[in-house]
Amino acid sequence: MLFYTLPTISLASVEEIEIVILESFPVQVQVIARGNLPDPCTEISEVLQEREGETFFTTIKTYRSPGFCIQVLAPFEEIIPLDVYCLPAGTYTVDVNGVQATFDLEVDNILSI
């Protein structure tokens, strides 16, 4: 066991991401991020997302309260919807805490009225 005297905020250790394109129109895209937290006392505290050009940058932050905790990895899975509405057709990159994957939008993702 380790004892922490201050809260700890850090990035989640993401091991893999999976991109899921839902069969709908407009298309919906989700990223499933999987990894391990350093202990069961650490939790996902915040998921931030921004897009620069054709790249989605997603940051998963963790929070750990001060105190004792057993030192054993705690797996996590976080499902993150991407804001892909109104995007033109093309290839896009997703980066979640440094782990990257790509997906293709076959057509412009705009609902015509």
Cite the ranges covered by each PLM segment.
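Exposed, flexible binding/inhibitory loops of compact, secreted disulfide-stabilized domains
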Residues: M1-I113
